[in-house]
Structures are given as C-alpha cells and as structure tokens.
C-alpha cells in the first residue's frame, strides 16, 4: 500500500446527542490514542470528551466546532502497514451546521450516527443532502442498541425513505435494550457477544447460523429470531458490493452501542476495508488528482485560540495532491505571495505535534497570523482555485456594539478573528455604519459573546435589528449596480470581503427589489 492508499479521511455526522463524540472517542480508543474515553455525559467524574476542547464545549457538553484527529489503525489479524485514519468530529447542534457543511468538503466519506430510539432527525436529513450534493459515500451506524428502541426493519425503511438512499445491513442486532445479546457481523460472518462496560469486545465467535452452537450462545428463541431476520435481510436487500457504496448509491448499516464499545470495532474494521482512499478534487481550472507529484491544498477551517495562552490562529489545510513538506515555499494563490511553514501540526484534538510531511487526505494545521481566509488555495506555483466552500445566507441578525470603549482594539481584533473562522458573518451597514452579525442559530451569538470576553478580554452587547434576508448582489453593468445601490442606499451593506450585500427587512422589500431591478442578480450563498 502506498501513502495515498492507506489514508482514510472521514467525518462523523449526526443530529445532536445521537452519540457522535462518544463514537469518535471509541475510535480513538481502538486506535490506541487515548487510554480511557471521557464518558461524555457523566458530570460526577469531570472527564470531558477528548474532542471537545473549547471551554464552552466542556461547560455545555456539546461540540461547537469541528475537531480534527488522526491515528494509525490495523484490524486484528491483519499484517502489513496500518491504515492512517483522519477523523473530523463535527458539531451536531444545528446552530453550528455551517461548520459541518464546510467540513464535508474536506472528507472522502462520512459515517452517519443515528439514535436507535429516535431514528432519522431533522439535522441528519440536512447533512445527508450535503453528502448527496458532493457524492460522498456514507456508512450508517445505528447507535444506542443497549436501550429500548425501535424495530431494526422499521429503522431501515425510515433510513431509505428519509435519506433517499438504498441501505444494506452489514451487521444485525440480537435483541435490544435489556435483552440485547450482541450483534451478528454479516460482513465477516461472526457472532459478537455483548458484555457491557468492557474496554474491548469480549468474545468473537465464528459460528454457522444453522448450528446448535448458536442456540447455546444466545438462547433458542433469540437464535431462531436471528435466523429468520437474516433470511429476510438476504431476501429484501441486494448483496453488498463495494463499488455501489463507493459511488454513494448504497449505504451499509451497522448496529451497536458506542458508549459500551459495542459494534464499534466491527464498524472500524469494515470501514478501513471498504472506504475510499483520497479522491480527486475539483478546482475551477481542472480536476486535481491525488497522485499528481506537485503539492496542492485548500483551507477549509480556521480556529482561533487552540491555546488560550497565545492568541494564535490555526488554519486547517486539506492536502489534495503531491506531498506537503515542512519549510518548503508554497504559493498562497489569493495573495500571490510565497509562504513557508516552520511548524505545521497534526492533531489529536488539542494535543498537536509538528509534522515533517503530509500526503493527500491528511489535514495539516498551519499557523495563521491573519493571512488565510476559508477557501484559500496553496500550490507549488500553479494558479488554482478550489471551489465549494459556501457561506449560506444567515437566518438571524443582530447589531453588535463594543461595550467597553477602552477595549476597542481587542474588540476589533477578536471580532475579525472570529469572522475569519467562519463562526458567523459580519456586514457593515453603509447607511449608518453599524455592524450587523448574521448567524444560522441563536447559540452562535452566545458563543461570540463568550469567546470575545474570555479569549480577547473584550465585552460586546447585542441590539435587535429587524432583517429578513441578506443576499449578495451583482450585475454585468456597473452603472446599473451603482444605480441600484443609490436607490436602495438604506439597505446596502458590505461583507468582510468587501462585496455588496442587500439587507432586506421583509420578503416584500426583497421581491419588489427583484421585480424592479431585473438585471441585478441576487445570490443566497456567497459562492457564485
């Protein structure tokens, strides 16, 4: 296996509280990266999840930003070089969906975590749409089987209907809740018996489905039920073919309980076996193949203050082709400057280590002193622009005001860094010069206020503003655009890139503007 073939870069996505961070932790446990997983919910023991590293995440018990982690993994019984797994744990909370959408541009496949009692939820649907748009293959993990939940067949029907994708179970639960005995691994034809709270799966038994041994292991009634279920599964669902999964036509389904470490190792073993290695990336100019000799990469996320003692920013760069080498000069395409990085890093959430070289599929953290924006491209000299990192039109708006005039410098710096990170969008109203912050959800306003105060020592206050939609406007004819801006002066604003934004305060104002100015184009994402 060469370096590219052994890479697996994927995101774990789900509705809030389906157990995504727990699943990430268990992967890290099997990858030997952590000795004990922080039981995510348990407040008596203040262990917090490894991948939730911001203060606010530790306080609230939810993930609010994507974290990047990598580890080597070799399934039991296999020899040779281990797989290099890069996990991106995303926030499930819908207020941070924007961060998750962007993360999906940097992965080759995804694992969707579904709560066995609740089934498909709103956020799961939305994320699946993004995967479909990008043709990203998905594996579905039905979690929390050790609690009373719904019938597995009902869940599979719901997955097909709600997510509009064909499914194929590769493992099957034996009972659930109190009666949960374990999982039959269809992919490897083994029986895995469940013992709660063990660090590893206790027994794996290769049994013939029709033998007496099965009755002895799980009980006669359960054994008969399992035989009937598997017969039905084989009758209803077509046999699993790796290619249909990779082309995103079929989603393999696994059952288990991430909290009790059950079904996770089967998922990981099968995942590294069938998941695609890094795929070609689309740039405006051409397709970029991972096997090309020259380095290319793009920035899909910027995070301020991984270390609160230093006001540092880290830009996350996904390597698309070639080989990234420390201290090599690379072209920063948007600025047209040559940059070198003396201390690029790779992550295990907050613990980071300096990296000498990185290959396609890897995520590298680059120290950023304000030169990067989301979507920037790095190359060895070629003019390339990677597409597909949109900002969506925000849903909620508020005026932001500096609450302490003595701290205006800290306030401005904090606001700039948080906006570069893509936490929210900032518009400056041309009419009154006030700053309007637009977000996807209420929680982001709290995060901005909290982080300004705790990371930048600056206080802000929010004031209400009545706005319906923000849309980016452009026209082929400059005079028409100027005329539009003069006529709609009180509604015009600029975003952080200096582009013209029309802030409509009602649907009526927006539709009238669209009718009166036929030659002006109104965009609801910033990627056009």
Protein language model regions, located:
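Structural and coupling elements of P-loop NTPases
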Residues: 1-528
């Amino acid at each position: 296996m060469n370096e590219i073939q052994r890479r697996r870069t994927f995101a774990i996505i789900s509705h809030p509280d389906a157990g995504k961070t727990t699943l990430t932790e268990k992967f890290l446990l099997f990858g030997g990266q952590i000795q004990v997983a922080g039981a995510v919910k348990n407040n008596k023991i203040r262990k917090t999840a490894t991948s939730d590293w911001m203060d606010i995440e530790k306080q609230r018990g939810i993930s609010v930003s994507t974290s990047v982690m990598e580890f080597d993994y070799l399934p039991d019984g296999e020899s040779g070089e281990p797989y290099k797994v890069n996990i991106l744990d995303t926030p499930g909370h819908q207020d941070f969906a924007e961060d998750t959408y962007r993360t999906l541009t940097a992965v080759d496949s995804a694992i969707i975590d579904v709560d066995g009692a609740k089934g498909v939820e709103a956020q799961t649907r939305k994320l699946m749409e993004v995967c479909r748009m990008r043709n990203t293959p998905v594996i579905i993990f039905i979690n929390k089987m050790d609690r009373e939940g719904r019938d597995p067949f009902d869940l599979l029907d719901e997955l097909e209907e709600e997510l509009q994708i064909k499914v194929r179970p590769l493992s099957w639960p034996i009972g659930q809740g109190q009666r949960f005995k374990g999982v039959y691994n269809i992919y490897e034809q083994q029986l895995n018996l469940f013992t709660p709270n063990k660090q590893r799966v206790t027994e794996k038994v290769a049994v013939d489905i029709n033998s007496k041994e099965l009755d002895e292991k799980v009980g006669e009634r359960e054994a008969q039920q399992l035989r009937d279920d598997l017969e039905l599964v084989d009758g209803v669902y077509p046999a699993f073919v790796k290619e249909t999964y990779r082309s995103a036509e079929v989603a393999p389904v696994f059952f288990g309980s991430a909290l009790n470490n059950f079904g996770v190792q089967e998922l990981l073993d099968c995942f590294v076996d069938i998941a695609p290695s890094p795929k070609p990336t689309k740039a405006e100019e051409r397709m970029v193949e991972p096997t090309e000799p020259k380095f290319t990469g793009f920035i899909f996320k910027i995070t301020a203050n991984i270390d609160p003692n230093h006001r540092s920013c880290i830009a996350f760069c996904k390597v698309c082709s070639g080989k990234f080498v420390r201290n090599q000069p690379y072209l920063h395409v948007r600025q047209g400057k040559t940059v070198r990085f003396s201390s690029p890093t790779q992550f295990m959430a907050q613990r980071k280590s300096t990296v000498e070289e990185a290959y396609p599929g890897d995520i590298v953290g680059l120290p950023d002193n304000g030169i990067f924006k989301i979507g920037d491209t790095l190359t060895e000299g070629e003019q390339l622009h990677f597409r597909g990192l949109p900002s969506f039109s925000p849903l909620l708006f508020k005026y932001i005001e500096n609450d302490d005039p003595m701290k205006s410098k800290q306030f401005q710096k904090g606001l700039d860094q948080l906006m570069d990170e893509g936490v929210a969008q900032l518009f400056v109203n041309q009419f009154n010069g006030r700053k309007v912050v637009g977000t996807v959800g209420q929680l982001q306003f709290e995060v901005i206020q909290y982080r300004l105060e705790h990371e930048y020592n600056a206080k802000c206050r929010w004031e209400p503003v009545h706005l319906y939609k923000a849309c980016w406007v452009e026209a082929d004819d400059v005079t028409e655009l100027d005329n539009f801006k003069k006529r709609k002066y009180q509604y015009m604003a600029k975003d952080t890139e200096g582009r013209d934004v029309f802030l409509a305060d009602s649907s009526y104002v927006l539709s009238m503007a669209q009718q009166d100015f036929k030659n002006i184009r109104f965009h609801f994402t910033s990627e056009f």
